[in-house]
C-alpha cells in the first residue's frame, strides 16, 4: 500500500475521489466499501461532480456501508441521524447508482 501525503485536505479529497473513479472506470461492477462522516463529505462531493461531468459511471457499482447506528427510530432513509440518510444526501441521490445495489448493516442484523 502506498501512503500519499498531499499539501491540503482539498487536494487529498480530490485525489481520493479520482482513485475511486479510476477503480470504477477500470471495473464497472466495482464493489465499494463506503464510510461516513465529515472526512468523506468532500470526497463524495467530488465524485458527484465527476459523475455529472461524465467522468465516472456508478450504474453498475455495488456499495456496502461499513456502519449504522442501532435503535434509530423510523426508517433509515428518513432518519437524519442514520448513515443511510447521510449516504443518500451526500452521494446516492446525486449519482446514477442503482439503490438496489447499495447495502448497509440492517437493524435486524445487529
Language-model features: where?
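N-terminal glycine-/serine-/threonine-rich phosphate-binding loop
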Residues: 1-32
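Short, glycine/charged-enriched secondary-structure capping and boundary segments
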Residues: 47-50, 78-80
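Glycine-rich beta-strand-to-loop/alpha-helix junction loops that act as flexible
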Residues: 34-39
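Ligand-binding beta-strand-loop-alpha-helix segment within the catalytic cores
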Residues: 57-107
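Generic structural signal for well-ordered alpha-helical scaffold segments
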Residues: 17-25, 48, 52, 88-92
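Phosphate-handling active-site elements
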Residues: 27, 53-59
Amino acid at each position: 500500500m502506498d501512503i500519499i501525503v498531499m499539501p491540503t485536505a482539498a487536494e487529498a479529497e480530490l485525489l481520493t475521489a479520482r482513485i475511486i473513479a479510476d477503480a470504477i472506470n477500470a471495473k464497472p461492477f466495482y464493489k465499494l466499501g463506503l464510510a461516513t462522516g465529515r472526512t468523506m463529505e468532500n470526497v463524495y462531493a467530488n465524485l458527484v461532480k465527476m459523475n455529472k461531468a461524465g467522468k465516472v459511471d456508478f450504474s453498475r457499482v455495488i456499495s456496502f456501508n461499513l456502519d449504522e447506528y442501532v435503535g434509530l427510530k423510523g426508517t433509515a432513509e428518513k432518519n437524519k441521524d442514520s448513515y443511510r440518510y447521510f449516504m443518500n444526501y451526500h452521494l446516492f441521490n446525486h449519482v446514477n447508482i442503482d439503490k438496489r445495489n447499495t447495502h448497509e448493516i440492517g437493524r435486524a442484523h445487529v
